[in-house]
Each structure stands twice: as C-alpha cells, then as structure tokens.
C-alpha cells in the first residue's frame, strides 16, 4: 500500500522510491520478539499481499489473522479448534500520530535483506522501524530497545487457506458470553 494522500506523504513522497507500509508481495517472516519483563519468543508472520491479510503464529496454541480489507481480526485456538472474530484493524508499525512524519535514517542489512530506518517520536517514545523497499518490516526499536527483529525472510506464494478459518472449527464465546461470529 502506498502512502499517497496520507499525512506521511508530504515528507516521504519526495524520496526516490515510494515507501510501502505493508508487504507488496507474499512473504513468510520469522521474528524474534522481546518485550520488557517477558521472555523472548519467536513469532511467524505470513503475508498474503494481494488480499492485505497477515497470519501471526506464536509459540502457543493460537494464531491470529488480521484482514485489513474487512477490518476484522480472527483468533484461532488450535488446541480446541475454535475461533473468535472481532472488528478492528491493528496499527501498522510505521504509523506515527497524525501530522508526524518519520525521518529517513541509515540503511541496514537484517536477515540478509537491505532496509531503511524510519524514526519518529510519539508521546515520549522514539520509534524506529527498518523497512525493505517492498514493505517488509525487519526491525522495530522503541527507545533504543529492539522489540522485534526478523530472523529469516522467505518470499514465496502463501496458500490462501492459511488465512481462513479452517473447516471444522467452531465459534468460541466472545467476551461477554455471546458467540463470536
């Protein structure tokens, strides 16, 4: 997705190449995630670029599917074969507050790919993301601490069925006791 027509475009559209905020082709990424006061985990994210859908699989018995076109989040419980659908779209890593454009920084090589750092301050936190020219997030740093960094990246077609509720899964109860669609 290009940033044309957004507040970020004022600064970024002047760059020699357009900045993509989401991957523009299918990709499978393994990240090391380090949250303060928590153990480090490995998370797999697979993008179906044509449909703007991402599937995140962590170390537990669940997966989360974010459908940006439908503004829908689906949580799959792999252990009991159930799912919960919620409305919403998560913020993108490169998503500063309105009116705050990120500054272009240095280039890096992470997981064998070149990326460019983009930095901005939000509230009191300084965020830096390193993005490839085709929109793959390779690193996210907040206040000098690396929260997320790619360990491996594989460009390959992703099977669309990975981004759907599997057959045989039942709706889970939503918070408040009602069924998730």
What are these regions (language model features)?
Residues 24, 93-141, 169-172:
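Extended beta-strand-rich segments in extracellular/periplasmic secretory proteins, especially
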Residues 2-53, 157, 161, 165-181:
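N-terminal leader/targeting segments and the immediate start of mature chains
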């Amino acid at each position: 997705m290009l940033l044309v027509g957004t507040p970020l475009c004022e600064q970024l559209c002047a760059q020699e190449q357009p900045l993509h905020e989401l991957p523009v082709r299918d990709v499978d990424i393994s990240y090391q995630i380090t949250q303060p006061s928590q153990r480090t985990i490995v998370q797999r994210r697979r993008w179906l670029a044509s449909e703007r859908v991402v599937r995140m699989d962590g170390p537990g018995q669940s997966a989360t599917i974010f459908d940006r076109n439908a503004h829908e989040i689906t949580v799959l419980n792999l252990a009991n074969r159930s799912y919960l659908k919620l409305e919403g779209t998560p913020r993108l890593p490169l998503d500063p507050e309105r009116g705050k454009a990120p500054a272009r920084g240095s280039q890096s090589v992470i997981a064998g790919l070149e990326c460019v750092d983009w930095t901005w301050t939000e509230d009191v936190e300084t965020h830096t993301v390193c993005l490839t020219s085709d929109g793959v997030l390779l690193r996210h740093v907040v206040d000098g601490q690396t929260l997320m960094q790619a360990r491996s990246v594989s460009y390959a077609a992703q099977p669309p069925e990975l981004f759907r509720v599997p057959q045989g899964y039942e709706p889970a109860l939503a918070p408040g006791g009602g069924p998730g669609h």
